[in-house]
Amino acid sequence: MPLSPEQIAIIRKKEAAKPDVLKRDNLTNYREGYFFITLNTRNESPILSTIEGEVGMPAGSPNAPHCKYTPLGAKVKEMWETIPNFHPTVTIIAAEIMPEHFHGLLFMKPGGNEHLGKVVNGFMIACTHEYWDTLGIPWRNAHPSQPSSNFGGAPPKKSDYKYTDRDHTYSFRGPSLFVRGYNDVVPITQGEVDIKIEYIRRQAERRLIKGEKSDLFKIYRNKHSKNWREDVVLNAIAADRFFKQNEKAKKDAQQNVRLRLNYDSQSIALDYLGNLELLASEKTIPLICHRADAKRFEEQKSIVLQAARNGWTVVSAFISPKEREIRKILLSELLPFIEIMDNGFSDRYKPTGTAFYACGERRMVQISCWNYKYERESVICREMCLVMNELSRIISKLPDDWWKQMKI
């Protein structure tokens, strides 16, 4: 029987209200493959573990960074490891229980009919049951006519249901352990699976670094510079060779950028995190690789790296493969840089991979002129590249071709 227009409207309304990160991808087969799952505790309560150890201690040593599970956290780990008992087509690969969230990596074998949502939902229910046991809620004997606030009494009114809400954060038995929904990431290659395993393994160390140097991971929002104005941004687009020849494309590009820029009550603003001393440095150089200079890239790379090794801070959006090649070297040689980001920062944003450690070791600033926009796969348009490159020029106070004209 087809859905009525009213039912379709209700479904669409619920889907629109759901956070982007929790929406499922209609093109993904959730019945087979690798999945990296993240669950958050209700109200982000840090009740599953504590982080102990010292940064830099070798793995396996008593003082190595690790998560010390609470009794509830240990039960969560136990429930995760018993998933194959109920879903034989599922293989458990790795997991870590952080104070306020859970990471797990699993593999769903081809040919199975189980949906990932069913597997995760069963795991969440089992964890909530353990949580209720911890709280002393007699959930095994409860039923809808006997809410936890009125066991054994007269048939309750709807208002008597203490643990009921529209988002299913609670049931009539008690509060849930995890908030509704989960974030899933689908690693495709074995290399990506290995990256996720390493990410899980280093969670405790990352948290210790973040906790010890929290100022470096704090996002400073809506900051201003007298040189960073809307007219500067729009002129950077208008000066582009392509847009000079196409008035309509120029206006469309400028409007697109206006929609993405970070505005506050005063003007366009900047958000950033990391070692703010790098932003105040007088020794900054822009890195912008142009196709016209492709044959001279090795020369440009050599001069940029020489400058960085001599105390200069590289400023770049690291858009092109050549720019990213230099970024990789900067990271490997522990050299400082300022990275212009192609998206805004979410509330819980932090750098990932080697950039996380660069930030923790005061070697990096990430700065954004954009509003945050959730995208599974980000595509950078021409006008965004122009804006980010202009910001790198403003920060460094040097033109693109400085490396052709001077030696440092």
Which residues does each predicted region cover?
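Short catalytic/metal-binding and nucleic-acid-binding patches
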Residues: 1-232, 236, 241
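Glycine-biased, small-residue-rich flexible motifs in mid-sequence functional cores and linkers
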Residues: 219-408
